[in-house]
Amino acid sequence: MSESPDNDPVIISVAAYSANPIAYQEKYATHLLDRPARFTSLLSPGSHILDLGCGPGRDIRIFSEGGHKPIGIDLNPAFIEMASRQGDVIQGDIRNISSIFTPASFDGVWAQASLVHLEKSEIDFVLRDLRELLKPNGHLYACVPATGETGWLDESDGRRWYTTWPEDSFETAVRSTGFHINDVTHGPYVEVWATKV
């Protein structure tokens, strides 16, 4: 991490969620709610899943109820507290994920809206690290914004950095880091379903 905490888009963006984490939880309670079940349908029972940027822990609960073994990671202390009621969670920066977990630890990596605050220059390193954390033929789901502008957005509860990925740019980034693309959904978000090869 080269930025100081005062200038780091990830640190500033993550801190903004502390203003009202309950409102965030309520706003996104049903957002893309069918995706976790689709993801787990690709996995064997009892799979180890990394919920990257787990937020309040909605998907940790869903994965646990489905018989899987999720662990969440988030940088925001308020989200860590909330998510820990749903299952195992640790506090950490996803940009340093390879120093937190050992290679080939997970059957699946779930990154729903957790890469949105990374700058494009950081995404290649993070995707390569995620690939290393997956077991052979492990699955990745990643969802990022496809519309809007890249840059700072002042919202009612704080300032956040968003990186948008128009057209096929995110799919290209995932493929270039050694993943096989199984499916891509385009819309306001780009959703990539991929496998480690």
What are these regions (language model features)?
Residues 1-101, 122-125, 129, 139-197:
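Class I (Rossmann-like) S-adenosyl-L-methionine-dependent methyltransferase catalytic domain
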Residues 99-109:
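A short acidic, Gly/Pro-enriched loop at the edge of an enzyme's catalytic core
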Residues 108-121:
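A short SAM/SAH-binding and catalytic strip from SAM-dependent methyltransferases
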